[in-house]
Amino acid sequence: MTGLEEWFESPIGRYLIEQEQAYFDQNVGDVFGYHAVQLGVPGFDFLRTSRMQLKVRAGPDLALDFFNMPFDSGSIDLAVLPHLLEFSCSPHQILREIERVVRPEGRIILSGFNPFSLWGLRRLATQSVAEPWCGNFISLSRMKDWLALLGFEVSAGRLCCYAPPFDQEKWLNRFAFMEKAGDRWWPISGGVYFLVAIKRVKGLRLIRPNWGINAALAPPVSELNKPRCRKSK
């Protein structure tokens, strides 16, 4: 068990992991394809609601070098990254490798700690060497910039964990009202953010059937099949 996974057993960790699990459960089930991989926090199954045929969790299922993954280019339909990048010495390099293995129009879903929040303030104040406070929290705007540079388009996202990061459960319960109020009154100050991003490739356009106005204006099949005769002059 990693230090972060041990922290998830604490009251504040459980407060976070319940919301993370709910978000991943809701979003991975809507992604279609054949191959899904979870990179990070291997002690929790964030792919459990995915309907893909092959689901791999780095750690219990497969030991991975995140900088050189044993997947073919463009072979992954969904990559889930729970708190992977903020505990890496080279997060942008990992993102480059993920961009390589994800197929065009494939998706990544990631979570990260928000440095511009009460949780970020605690990290600065404590200067702890324990996870998660020792991590390099990456801002939401910087993460979006990195994704855009690699050709990913952010399609959805949200923040959560607006309550102060108390270690005691009684204090978390007293500030539970902030969770519902946060989305309305201070939506960018949640302690944790989620992003869903789609890999876009220049020049690639999905062809969809056109059942709109052109189909409505087309003549009936019976008219098309009728023999046509010329009038004699």
Regions found by a protein language model. Name each.
Residues 177-233:
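C-terminal lobe and adjacent flexible extensions of AdoMet/dcAdoMet transferase-like proteins
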Residues 154-179, 188-189:
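Conserved catalytic loop of SAM-dependent methyltransferase domains
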Residues 1-29:
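Class I SAM-dependent methyltransferase Rossmann-like catalytic core
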Residues 125, 134-157:
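Short alpha-helix
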Residues 22, 26-72:
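Class I SAM-dependent methyltransferase SAM/SAH-binding core
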